[in-house]
């Protein structure tokens, strides 16, 4: 975040109407010899109680202590932006209410879809539409792995190690390969269109650990691609959500989303079909 604010300093200042300066960085560690060494603080209350601070960006990850910190910032009248999907999936509705009660914004565009701007279109541009379906490739790590298995005939363990070596997969890849990561993301997107909190723990979730090279061969023979999809469909007055590997026809827009890229396919009763595409893992 600090790097982006520095690289695009002039452009950001022009769009904001004034310079955006980083005053504090909250961390347990010290960073001697770096540009932020004099900005490090270890107590979040220093930030919450400083009247000069108008915007807080949370990049900690996890639900706690992020929830405690973010709630305190909103209650102190700070605008908050986060990329923390775990926090938004678990506490998003509560934090949105806290923000509304205190006349500030809780923004979470970066929590879903990597480099794809999907939250704002759903929240702002498509509010008059009845969104009937959201289907997405929402995890760049597993999409990279499935692409490698498809293109090179590699097995699961081999492509997982490759993804870890490249920094796409964590040392503990459970959240990615078991589908927990896209499950949280589809819960967030469904919450937006449903107008109420959708609990990710209620969504059936299956990852890619059982996919074999033989499965890939069968899919290719049928002109299909295996993708880990997170989907949400409107059924009557409710929504049905699912995360699982699918075999999709090679004419489907998502079949061409490969490597670390993400894609989100929307269907609205007025909009019709729309596709959002952009970088996933590593962004």
Task: Name each region found by the language model.
Residues 53, 100-181, 188:
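Rossmann-like NAD(P)H-binding beta-loop-alpha module
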Residues 61-63, 139, 248:
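Short glycine-rich anion-binding loops that position phosphate/pyrophosphate groups of nucleotides
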């Amino acid at each position: 975040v600090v790097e982006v604010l520095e690289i695009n300093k002039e452009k950001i200042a022009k769009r904001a109407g004034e310079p955006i300066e980083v005053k504090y960085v909250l961390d347990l560690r010290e960073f001697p010899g770096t540009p932020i060494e004099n900005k490090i603080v270890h107590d979040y209350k220093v930030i919450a109680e400083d009247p000069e601070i108008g915007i807080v960006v949370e990049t900690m990850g996890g639900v706690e202590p992020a929830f405690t910190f973010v709630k305190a910032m909103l209650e102190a009248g700070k605008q908050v932006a986060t990329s923390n999907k775990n926090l938004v999936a678990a506490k998003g509705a509560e934090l949105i209410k806290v923000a509304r009660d205190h006349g500030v914004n809780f923004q979470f565009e970066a929590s879903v879809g990597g480099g794809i701007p999907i939250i704002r279109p759903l929240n702002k541009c498509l509010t008059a539409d009845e969104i009937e379906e959201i289907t997405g490739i929402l995890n760049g790590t597993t999409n990279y792995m499935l692409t490698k298995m498809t293109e090179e005939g590699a097995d699961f363990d081999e492509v997982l190690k490759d993804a870890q070596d490249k920094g796409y997969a964590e040392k503990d890849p459970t959240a990615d390969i078991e589908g927990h990561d896209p499950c949280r993301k589809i819960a967030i997107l469904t919450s937006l269109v449903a107008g109420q909190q959708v609990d990710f723990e209620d969504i059936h979730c299956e990852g890619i650990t059982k996919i074999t090279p033989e499965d890939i061969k069968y899919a290719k023979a049928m002109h299909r691609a295996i993708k880990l999809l997170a989907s949400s469909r409107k059924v009557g007055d409710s929504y049905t959500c699912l995360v699982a590997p699918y075999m999709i026809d090679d004419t489907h827009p998502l079949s061409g989303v490969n490597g670390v890229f993400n894609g989100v396919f929307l269907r609205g009763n007025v909009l019709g079909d729309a596709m959002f595409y952009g970088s996933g893992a590593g962004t």
